Amino acid sequence: MSGDGRGAAEVVPQSAEQTGERFVVPPAERFAGLMAEVMAAAERFGHRQHVHLTWLAVRRHGTAAAVDLVGEGIRRTALAAGAPEKYHATMTRAWVELVGHHAGRAGTALDGGADRSDRADFEAFADRHPELLDKALLSRFYRTATLASAEARAGWVEPDLRAFPWHAER
């Protein structure tokens, strides 16, 4: 991974000790892998699948790297679908940070669980944090007009109704 944790991930195969092999997985491929994993058990990519994909990214790469990985992945996906206007920078980052906050509080391991599948872990996580499955959750933190603004679509805008929980806890 790059020094800031946001570049391509380095993958060390199981035989790495013997061969010294290392592979670099570009962010686009990491996002595609996460998307394929989420969609393997889904008929459509709705809000729950967005949260699941985000949770996987946070769990495997940490919140800071997941902001970029998920943001760029969704932006590229919207562009490829001919709907670049569907990408929303503030909403994407806010959701990643909310999922990351709750994953950290839940004691979710960022390196994956050895005794349970990611799917089972996600279902348990979603059961513990049903508020994350509420598409209107961001309305607790942002005015509708703020989220509808061109500024919020194009880049990060801080909440204007209430601070995120991790800011309030400081």
Spell out what each predicted region is.
Residues F23, P27-F31, E43, H47-V51, ...:
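Active-site-proximal alpha-helical scaffolds that flank and shape metal-associated catalytic sites
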Residues E21, F45, P84-E85, E131-L132, ...:
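Alpha-helical interaction segments
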Residues S2-R22, E29, T108-A120:
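Intrinsically disordered, low-complexity terminal tails and inter-domain linkers enriched
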Residues P26, V38-T108:
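Conserved, aromatic- and glycine-enriched, well-ordered alpha/beta core segments
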Residues V12-Q14, V25-P26, H129, F164:
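Intrinsic-disorder/low-complexity coil detector
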Residues H88-R170:
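A charged, amphipathic interaction segment
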